[in-house]
Amino acid sequence: MKKAKKIASLVVASALLTSSFAAITSVNAAEVDSAQTASADSTLRDKVGDGVMLHAFNWSYNTIKENLPAIAAAGYTTVQTSPVQQPKDYSTSGDVTGQWWKLYQPISFHIAEQSWLGTKDDLKSLCDEADKYGIKIICDIVSNHIANADETRPDSVSNQVKKYEPEFYKKRRTYTRTYKGDANDSSVQAVVQGHVSKCPDLVTNDTAVQTYIINLLKECIDCGVDGFRFDAAKHIETEDDGEYASDYWKNVTTSASSYYTQKTGDDLYIYGEILNNCGADRSYSSYTKYINVTDNRTGDAVLYNVTRGKASTATNAKYKSGVAASNAVLWAESHDTYEGNSGSSGYSNTSSVSDEDVVKAWAIVASRKDSTALFFARPGTALMGGVSTDTTYKSTAVSEINKFHNLFVGQSEKLGSSGDIAYVARGTSGIVLSNCKGTNASVSISGTGLADGKYTDTVSGAEFTVANGVLTGSIGNTGVAVVYNGTTTPKAINSVESGSFRGDTMTLTLGLENATSGTYCLDDSTPVKFTGTTSIRIGSDYKPGETITLTVTATDGVKTSSMVYKYTKSTAQESGVYVFFNPATQKGWSAPYQVYIYDETTNKGTVYKNANWPGEAMTLDPATGY
């Protein structure tokens, strides 16, 4: 399309907004070795365990790929996908609540041929692209159970398995347990052979079953995957489970790890989901000799205490699982606490907890020494396969916490509190503050261990000072401060993530943080300068199926950052809704008859029109009229 056409497609309305400060990256080289950072403008770590992970819940592989620049800019070393296997009852419905759980009831031991996540080729393409950003991809694996045919008979294998795994289906009675009870913590057998989510439990001590899993892991590694999360790991037996013991973890992890090392020369990262405890007096050490594990009680407790304003208990340094920090995966919330009811400390479900409080809890769990932290990207109004419309995962506060984690790898930690302020100090030159009772706050804290000097809050840009061992400064309106010898970087904000849109046009709102001005341009058009906030409407001169590339920059006069977004205009689809007009109202009408529909409530910032004015020609139905 011609440049003039791109410019004509924009309708611009600007409003003055005072810029707030946002930060992105550097640190005092005397405290943190700059050679440890991925590049001058990146803090990403080389190893999964040293960085922070983004749980791209339900995102398709292509969606993740499209958002890799933003993910890297937000400081995530690793992205975790949803389960890769073929899900039970796959449909094209995008309803998250009705569909997400199907990914945890697999009907195959291969990367899915059809799912909301995409194809095997899509996964490979994602991994190839992620490598360019220094981002690792880990995949969720369901190997404890297989999909059921009937929830009233949890030992019944779904007949859908026959299509994808015919040999397994023939021997399904050999490869699944005969134990009738649901999984619970009352006995070792109930833990490791009970039915999870009313699904048939796999005979994971069987060599053939282990081979199915090992081959799945190798298939993923061949695509470029760098690690795995094992769903329901607690319910798969260990070598120490007596008469129920097996060599599953040894065989599966050794085979996958050696295969990965042969192909890459690096170490494979594996962690397993263990909720609350190992059950029946079993030990975490039976798992940690082979994998890292979730410590959900620690993260759950931090979130609960933050929401209750209990700074002192939110900063309890003890890991509730008792595992070493280097073996622990922490979170502020997970997909199960958000979509389900698995929370362990005050909240069984966390969907009612504000984004603000989740970020405050994240400030504590993600700034700790040696442990790995997982940030759950709340879906917002996104459909299955789509990018989260809740963009907290890449907010300035979360991004700066992530970068702090990355920069201070190896530094000592000190957790503490002062009044309503919880903190995690690292070494002698960095500290993260979380206000458990509000947002803006002036602080005066002694005993943090920080050396005397001046520091910057890389969230708000405010100056902090340590004099005679007392830290003073002001926390900004996020309730979080990330304080070290860092600098700020200009940042452009966009109200709509990359993806597709329906309707003739879509409206975006652009903003600035820590910047004096910015620019935007569509495809090859001339950049348009803006300050404050600006609304632009795109799409009117594009046909369905065409993709619009939007480039947005921000500058503070010294530094400039940029971000690229891609929007595809979708082909209009019939809704199945028909409108009939009462013949009595048609007496005064004159042909030709047209209908014009205008709806600005379809999505935030989106306007739907069935056609340009005067609309579409109406059709005469002899029985009911036009």
Please identify what each model-predicted range represents:
Residues 30-57, 66, 72-73, 162-183:
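N-terminal carbohydrate-binding accessory modules
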Residues 1-31:
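Gram-positive Sec-dependent secretion signals
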Residues 489-572:
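Low-complexity, disordered linker/stalk regions enriched in Pro/Thr/Ser/Gly
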Residues 36-60, 197-200, 577-598:
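Boundary/entry segment of secreted carbohydrate-active catalytic domains
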Residues 61-63, 70-78, 123-135, 141, ...:
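An active-site-proximal structural segment forming one wall of the substrate-binding cleft
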Residues 526-528, 533, 586-626:
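Aromatic-rich carbohydrate-binding modules that target alpha-glucans
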Residues 31-50, 65-70, 83-106, 125-135, ...:
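Active-site-proximal helices and loops of the catalytic beta/alpha 8
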Residues 47-51, 87-126, 163-200:
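Aromatic- and acidic-residue-enriched carbohydrate-binding clefts of CAZyme catalytic domains
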